């Protein structure tokens, strides 16, 4: 698989490419299946439909990897938190965590066993996927998942989380540790179900100041990665902490690919990290609105990463109103322009 070869810095005939949120609302085919499912969470829990939308970007765009369709918050959901998605508001937990008692009510022993709909979707997708295409499993980072569990929803300033971080860091560490243990087992089950690679999304990494990022986020991601790499050395692990371009000098550990977001200069990440890791990224997602902007962005990134191990991706998720034609143009342009 070209994607897996690139993760391990092996030579590839061209630069492999996939897109975060590639199974998503910009595809009319996705919207049709989502309508049939009824709502977002029902789609996540219907393994046949989740598999169907995971495969759509392979069939429509010919990307080099599929990522399983799911959500990072199914983990706290199955630990016993009451999750709902409100239109225009995103995810909401009606019972956010603020005390040790709240945390102790959560089931960390059986949560990974209740996520069979994810594993079944992975199995079905891997069966249907051609052998040269990789299947990516994923989870959120403990820190990013914890922000939703503590805030009760998305947040602009993470005030409740940060209040806990400074007033009661022991409790925050207990929450993060409990999540970490569940996520290890969750990812292991994903690998057993057919995932060829794992990505850990740390979407809210940039909410933390320098030292706190390493203490409350990165160290927990590394604990998960160390667990996976010790048991499954042939499964590449991708870490994607978003918005931490100022923290790159301390990025080190046992993983394979570092995801670069669009706000980080790629040459900076290349100079600091490409001797150790394959880099993934980092096209500004809004460039996909315009074909000239796509061409300019692709040329710049390919030039920056010339002769370095690289997986092409957006610097965050594809937006819902991107024309499908532009997405197709983007994928084809990368694959053809980078052909050796």
From Swiss-Prot:
It catalyses: uroporphyrinogen III + 4 H(+) = coproporphyrinogen III + 4 CO2. InterPro entries: UROD/MetE-like_sf, Uroporphyrinogen_deCO2ase_HemE, Uroporphyrinogen_deCOase. GO terms for cellular component: cytosol. Keywords: Cytoplasm, Decarboxylase, Lyase, Porphyrin biosynthesis. CDD domains: URO-D (cd00717). Pfam families: URO-D (PF01208). Substrate binds at residues 21-25, 71, 148, 203, 316. GO terms for biological process: protoporphyrinogen IX biosynthetic process from glutamate. Its EC number is 4.1.1.37. Pathway: Porphyrin-containing compound metabolism; protoporphyrin-IX biosynthesis; coproporphyrinogen-III from 5-aminolevulinate: step 4/4. It is found in: Cytoplasm. Its main location: cytoplasm. The record marks 71 as: Transition state stabilizer. GO terms for molecular function: uroporphyrinogen decarboxylase activity. Signal peptide: none annotated. Belongs to the uroporphyrinogen decarboxylase family. Catalyzes the decarboxylation of four acetate groups of uroporphyrinogen-III to yield coproporphyrinogen-III. This is Uroporphyrinogen decarboxylase.
């Amino acid at each position: 698989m070209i994607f897996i070869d690139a993760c391990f810095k092996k030579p590839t005939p061209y630069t492999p490419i996939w897109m975060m949120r590639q199974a998503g609302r910009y595809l009319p085919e996705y919207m049709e299946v989502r309508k049939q499912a009824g709502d977002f969470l029902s789609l996540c829990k219907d393994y046949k439909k989740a598999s169907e939308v995971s495969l759509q970007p392979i069939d429509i765009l010919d990307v080099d990897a599929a990522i399983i369709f799911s959500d990072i918050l199914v983990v706290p959901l199955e630990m016993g938190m009451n999750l709902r998605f409100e239109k225009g508001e995103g995810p909401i937990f009606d019972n956010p965590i603020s005390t040790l008692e709240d945390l102790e009510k959560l089931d960390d022993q059986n949560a990974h066993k209740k996520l069979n709909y994810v594993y079944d979707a992975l199995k079905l997708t891997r069966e249907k996927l051609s052998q040269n295409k990789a299947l990516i499993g994923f989870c959120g980072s403990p820190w990013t998942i914890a922000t939703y569990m503590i805030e009760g929803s998305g947040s602009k300033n993470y005030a409740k989380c940060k209040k806990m971080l400074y007033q009661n860091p022991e409790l925050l560490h207990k929450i993060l540790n409990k999540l970490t243990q569940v996520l290890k087992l969750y990812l292991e089950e994903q690998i057993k179900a057919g995932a060829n690679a794992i990505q850990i999304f740390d979407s809210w990494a940039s909410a933390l100041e320098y030292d706190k990022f390493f203490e409350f986020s990165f160290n927990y991601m590394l604990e998960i990665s160390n667990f996976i790499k010790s048991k499954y050395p042939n499964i590449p692990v991708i870490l994607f902490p978003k918005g931490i371009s100022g923290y790159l000098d301390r990025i080190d550990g046992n993983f394979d690919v570092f995801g670069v977001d669009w706000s980080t200069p790629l040459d900076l990440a290349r100079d600091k990290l490409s001797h150790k890791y394959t880099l993934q990224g980092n096209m500004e997602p809004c460039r996909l609105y315009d074909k000239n902007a796509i061409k300019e962005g692709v040329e710049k990134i390919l030039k920056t990463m010339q002769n370095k191990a690289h997986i092409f991706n957006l610097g965050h998720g594809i937006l819902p109103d991107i024309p499908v034609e532009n997405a197709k143009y983007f994928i084809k342009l990368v694959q053809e322009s980078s052909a050796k």
